Amino acid sequence: MAVKKISKVQPERFEFDPKNKQTADRIIQNYPQGKQQSSVMALLYLAQKQNDNWIPLSAMKYIAKYLDMPYIKVYEVATFYSMYNLTPVGKYFFQVCTTTPCMLRGAYNLVEVCKKKISEEENMLSKDGKTSWLEVECLGCLLYTSDAADEITG
């Protein structure tokens, strides 16, 4: 599996829009006093949703300030979990598990299909900008790997 990539093109600023700011405040209120930093995952998801399904570095810095926590802690969470996208993704976004059990069931066939049909490298948008793909850790879909490859390749 490849190292999680950070987009080279980054917006300078990010802040929650008024609706998401209200949502963030409601989320934070669900945590006991002194434990509000535990809402970091929910706020990262909210930022990703607001920013076309990816999280720029400026959003991580904003969330760190919003939660009064070190930026590196937000960065660690965002880079650890595959549910957070750190590069722009297409409307159609494929995640392919390439851990050993899935590899044995044909996951690399799916990777080859993605390379041919979407883009040569993961984390890159297709030529039309609508589709992207990424290698990830286990998705819990081991039974479907070869079926998916057959369905995609015809």
Place the predicted regions along the sequence by residue.
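Single conserved hydrophobic/aromatic residue that forms the stacking wall/gate
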Residues: Y144-D147, E151-G154
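Ferredoxin-type iron-sulfur electron-transfer modules in oxidoreductases and energy-metabolism complexes
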Residues: I6-L46, N51-F94, T98-S146
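Acidic, Mg2+-coordinating active-site segments of isoprenoid diphosphate-utilizing enzymes
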Residues: A2
